[in-house]
Amino acid sequence: MFRGIQGKIIFLAVIIGLLPGIVGVTLTYLGGTHLLKNSIGSNFHELARKESEYMRRVIEKEIDEVHSLAISPFIRKYIEDANLKYNSKGNEEIIREINSIENIWPRLKDNSPIIREIINNEIAEYIKEYKKREGEEYAEIFITDTKGAVIAATNKTSDYFQADEKWWEEAYNNGKGSVYLSDVEYDESAKVFALNFCIPIMDKSNKRVIGIIKVIADIKHLFSGIINVHIGETGHSDLVSSDGTVIIDAISPPLSWKINEGLISKISASRGGWTLDKDEHGINSIIGFSHVEWGSKFSASSLGNKNWYIFVRQDMPEAYTPIFGLLWKVSIVGVLLIGIFTLVALSIARQIVRPLLILQDGVGLIGQGKLNQRLEIKTKDEIGDLANSINSMAVELENRTNELE
């Protein structure tokens, strides 16, 4: 392919330019991706850690706010008065009365006397005003008495009797009271994905539960700080439970995805860090994560006995965009250098080959008997020396030929 000297010289120059270029691009990619990967991973871990601290503050703030309702003298007095109706009744009679309302509850309209008494009494108006001040964060608030019957609510609840529900039993805690947070779930009554804050209302001595308040918080508003995190086109944060369920993120409906078991096992072994793995959508990603550390503000059985983690992740192709941009720049510079090498090599090759072509043509003419042919090569190198030697040989041959004639 490159039989001529000129072609070989050009080929050699291209190879000399190409090999360092390939090595440079490879080292740039390997070194750059390693540094970028570590930098992004560390930054994502730090962002996840801050998000987890934010999450803890949000939950603790909500507990404090709901607790402020639970200790309100106005609410406590109303519940104490409501509980008086049980004093003159036996347990069977109480159960019978509660069941009689529970059985007809689904058929009752908002304008029925029973419902109006619950959603329009003075405590109901009080918690409605409180809910209004909180905006869209609270989807529903209601209060039960000591037996689990709803006595005040912002709107009609799905059930009248609540004492057979897990959340009520946890918050009641055998009459001793305990702050309980439910697992995130879809609430049929409020029609939202919700986190329920269940706070016991204690008597004045703070030793006996007299009622329970339940606040149903819409997680889209409660966790807006998670939803609003965006990094580039694909980067965002997720709130993930220890069973792998993505509770909420910026791009999917709540509770609609699960991450792979390998990833959840990896993060469960650490309180925080970063890793490379497939995210909940099966996309290779850089993922920073941090465990949400809770205090002692709620019972250990809260949140479905699950841990929560914050993920901050981004698709790897997008994360590596700066490296790809650098590679393009390095490649363009490499192509330009190869072009320059080629042009320089072509110029040098022509300077080398031109005397050789003159030499070739001249030797051919001398060989044909034209002994007066002289090689006009003035280069001060081996080719010039060879041309002078051939010229001397031609002169000698010409003289000998003339003598013979």
Model-based region annotation:
Residues A124-N228, K278-H281:
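Extracytoplasmic/periplasmic ligand-binding sensor regions of membrane-associated signaling proteins
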Residues R3-H34, N38, S42, I332-V333:
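Extreme N-terminal signal-anchor transmembrane helix of membrane signaling/transducer proteins, especially
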Residues S42, L47-R49, V58-K176:
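Extracytoplasmic/periplasmic sensory segments of membrane signal-transduction proteins
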Residues I10-L12, V25-L30, K329, V333-R354, ...:
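Cytosolic-side ends of inner-membrane transmembrane helices, especially those
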Residues F44, E62, I352, L359-G362, ...:
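Hydrophobic core positions in alpha-helical repeat/coiled-coil coupling domains, especially the HAMP
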Residues K50, F74, E80, N111-E137, ...:
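Solvent-exposed, extracytoplasmic
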Residues W257-W328:
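Extracellular/periplasmic juxtamembrane segments that couple receptor/chemosensory ectodomains to their
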